[in-house]
Amino acid sequence: MKKITRLFDIPYYQKEKFNTAEAFVTKYNGKWVSTSSQEYIIKAIQVSKALMALGIQKNDKIAIISTNNRTEWNIMDIGILQTGAQSVPMYPTISEEDYAYILNHSEAVFCFVSDAEIFNKLQRVRNQIPSLKEIYCF
């Protein structure tokens, strides 16, 4: 890699320069789990391929909502950007009405969330968001 010109170039640069076994570390059920630079890239590519299989097009908007700092958020973000789509990061603590407003304004077609609580909040306003095709939990 010669130069970073896009956000999704960063994981590839990181792997080439540092190739760390602990690019990300997240606590799951009280245990710390590491994700290497290579795993990060592989998982982001898998996300990109899955989104393309779902029909994502360049400039589509995809929302991401997480209640805490998680490896999956970063993987989703890079996976989204690699497809040419745009990430719409959202705070987990906003109201259902704010979710509906932001998702409508951004015209998000998919939303990825970290847990059932956020999923349920979105489900309660889903009928107000015509562009939203699906909500997924990571």
Residue ranges, per PLM feature:
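Domain-wide signal for the mature, well-folded portions of proteins, strongly enriched
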Residues: 8, 27-28, 38, 125, ...
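Conserved AMP-binding/adenylate-forming core of the ANL superfamily
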Residues: 23-78, 95-100
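A general structural detector for well-ordered alpha-helical segments in enzyme core domains, enriched
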Residues: 10, 65, 118-122
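A short N-terminal helical cap/helix-turn-helix that marks the beginning
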Residues: 2-23, 42
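A general structural motif
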Residues: 19-21, 59, 132
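Structural core segment of the AMP-binding/adenylate-forming
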Residues: 82-138
